[in-house]
Structure formats: structure tokens, C-alpha cells
Amino acid sequence: MRSNSFPALRWVSLFLILAAVAVITLQLVSFSRLGTNFPAGMEIAEVPVGGLDRATSAQRLLEAYSTTPVELHYGEEIILLTPASAEFELDLEAMLAAADQNRSQQPFWTGFWNYLWRRTAAPVSIPLIASFSESRLEAYLENEIAQRYDQPPIPPLPAVGTVNFHPGTQGTALNINRSVDLVDTALRSPSRRVVDLPLAKTNPPKPSIGNLEIMLKQIVDLAEFDGLVGLYLADLQTGEEINFAYSQGEDFSTNPDVAFTSASIIKIPIMVSAYRRLDEDPDSETTRLIEEMIVKSGNDPADWLMERVIDPFTGPLDVTADMQTLGLENTFLAGEFYPGAPLLAAFQTPANLRTDINTDPDIYNQTTPSDIGMLMEDIYQCTQRGEGNLLAVFPDEFTQAECQSMINYLGNNDLGLLIEAGVPDGTPVAHKHGWVTYFGVMNTLGDAGIVYTPGGNYVLSIFINHQDQLIWEPASELVATMSEATYNYFNQVTR
């Protein structure tokens, strides 16, 4: 019985051995065929290529990187950027060679053993090797996107019939440098290929200064003022200017400018001439005289200051000489203020020799809107950087601190009318106003100052004249309204 079963057992064992050999042989053949493919778990440039051959892997990489566009979002707009637009190129040969090298480094029988036991090898990742043209990408972003989708800001526009401007609108501009970095990152990823383009808000510029000039003349027209308005404005940031003489829809030349009675505004040149001659801080009496002359508009303090600091006999002429040296040829003071003061000289200027227009200016004191405005500019420039015309013409005779003291005195002239009435409460205004009545009749009114605002500082000098009579209320309101329009020009609302 035992002798009959033993051969059967041997045959069964032999069969099992042969079967095992056959299975192993089949697995070996199968594994050998897989040897031409990349191992399971391998990635090239984040693209899974495990079990794929070289050609199929290359196709997968091309589909992921070279065929699939990058989706660019410009606000609500969607733009598809093909990698070729940036000359993006995969170095397939280098990446596949690196993958081949990694595969060949694994021992055959170790791999076969892992294959038999279905063990997954440690994942292998081959990094991306690619290049693109930064200049081509920049050109694409500039020409195809920025030029097409950027929105320029819209400047504020005058609101006809008012002193206001319609708010300007911000624009948008593509940040190209930052966009290049973001698109570069997206081009190098097979899955994160959406880019929200970085946009910068661009603030609208101020309207052209010509728009302000038109508005100021419209204000005169709407007020139905039938006299003459002389105005000088200087943007202290840009140097842009407005200078006009305007009456009943007609523009008069400002070369030379129009001569007006300067009245108390001539006290600004007096103060400048006094400070030119002060070698140190003024004593208490000089300080009192300057303050009463500027802040209280005292005439006697003006005379006493000239006699004390400038010259007891020729003070007015010395003030005039200083102004002419500064190039202000239409500004003069021909005598002191006290009643009956002698006329020390008869001045003829390009402004008062005009025959086309005549404001009947006082023979004792005259200026023009541009002359006094430019003098205010000179003082301002001296305070800012210790430079400007004052220091150029009179070197070592003015200091930055002295110029600031002059501004401080003018800033304490708190009238609350004219230029000051046109700006918000608390706005610093360094100014001097002036008018004269003859037998109870006022013909000329003026105000000149520096206005300090969040949107920029400026000089504004306004003179108005009427041959018959200026009525205070409409005349002062006209100056205030032009001042308000100017403030609004420099301080725009943006939406």
C-alpha cells in the first residue's frame, strides 16, 4: 500500500515544482518586459510615468506642459497663454535620461523580488528641466494684455457752473514684473496653471491747469462782474502757472502784467527788505512793528519799521530798489503811508505805461498779480530748502529761518475772508490783503498768499478793480469763490 502511494506523491511534488518554475518563469518574463518601462511610483516633473515607456512618458510631459495653456485672469477677463508664446521648452532628453539612469541603478533581482511580492519601490521624482524666454513673456504681457486690458485713470473734470470737479476715476495697470514671476511658476507646474494677474490701481492726475483757468473765468462770468480781474497762480510742486487779466469775456495781455494799487499788500515787500538788513534775530521792538504791520495791517508800524531798519529817509525807495533787483519791475513804494507823506519819486513801469487798460493805480504804491505772486514764491522756496531767487540775488542776506519767520507772520493774518474764505477751516494760509477807499469808495481789492493743502501747496494772487466802485460783499465773495475753485483743483476726490 505504502509502495503504491509514494510514486504518486513524487509525481504531485514534481508537478508542483514544475508549476512553480513555470509561474516564476512567466513572472520573470513579465518583469523583464516591464524593464523597458519606468518603475512604479516614478514621476518626471510631477507627472506620473510609472509603468510607461519612454515615448509615452514624453507624450505625457508634452501634454502637461507644452500643450496645456496657462489660464491668466485679468479681473473678470480670462486669457489663455500658450507656453509657446513665452518660448517655453521642455528638455525631454535630459529628464528621460535622468529617469533611465535612476531605473538602471536598481539591481535586477532586487527589483524582481519586489515585483513578485508586489512591493512598491520608494517613489522617485525627476525634477523639471525647462526654459522660457523672459523677454518674450514680458513682450506678450505688455502688448497682448496690458495694452488691451489696462484702464487709464480718468482725471477729474470741471462741473460746469460750480466751483467743483467731478471725481476722477482710478485706472488699473498690470504689474508686469510680478506677473512674469507668477507665470513662470505656473509654466513649471502641471496642475497649478491658473494665475491671477497682479493689478495696480493708478490714481487719476489733476486736470490740466488750463481747465482751472477756464473755470476761474467762468466764475467771473457767472458772477456778472463787469470790472477787471487780475490773477496769478503758481503750483509750487510743478511750477505750472496761470496768469490772466480778464474783463467781461475779454482776455488782456499779461506781458507786461496789469498795474494795480497794492495798498497794504506792499507791506510784504517792506517785510522782505527789512529782513534783508537784519543780521540777527530782530529785537522786541522790531518784532512788534513787523507783527503790527502784517497781522494788524498797521500803516504807522510800516513807516516806523522802514525808518528803524531800512533807512529813515529813503526807506520806500530802498524797498523799491530791492524789488527791482529781484526782477519785480512793476512793484514800487514811492512814499510812506502817513497822510501828506511826500512823493519821493514818480515811477514809470511797463505795467503802468500800458494804454490798453488802466486801473488808475495809486502813484504811491503799485504791483501786479504776478509780481507779488512771484515774491511769495521766492519766500516759500527759501523756507523749503534754503534756496530760490531771494538767496540767489541776495546771498548771505537771508536765512531759511528768516524766511520761515516771514511766512509765520503772514500766517497769523487771520482774516477769515477773501482767499481764506475759500478754503476749509484749519487750512494754513500765509497771506496779505489790501484795499483803499477814497472818499468812501473802493475801486481795488487784492489778496496774495501761499495756501498749504494736502493735495499740494500753491501761491494765489488776486486783484479786482472796478472803475466806478467795488461793493464789498460781491467783490470779496468773488475772490473767495475763485479761491475755493483753486483749492478744489488741488484736492480732488477720487472714486
Report each predicted region and the residues it spans.
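Surface-exposed, secretory/extracytoplasmic low-complexity segments enriched in Ser/Thr/Asn/Gly/Pro
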Residues: M1-Y246, D251-T254
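Second-shell loop/turn segments in exported
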Residues: M42-G50, A121-S131, F165-L174, T202-P207, ...
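Sec-exported extracytoplasmic/periplasmic mature domains
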Residues: L62-S66, S104, E142-A146, D184, ...
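Active-site-adjacent helix/loop patches that line small-molecule binding or acyl-intermediate pockets
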Residues: N211, D226-G230, E285-G373, E377-Q381, ...
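Active-site-proximal beta-strand/loop segments in catalytic clefts of secreted hydrolases
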Residues: A234-Q237, A245-S247, A274, I294-S297, ...
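Active-site SXXK
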Residues: G239, V258-D281, M293, L460
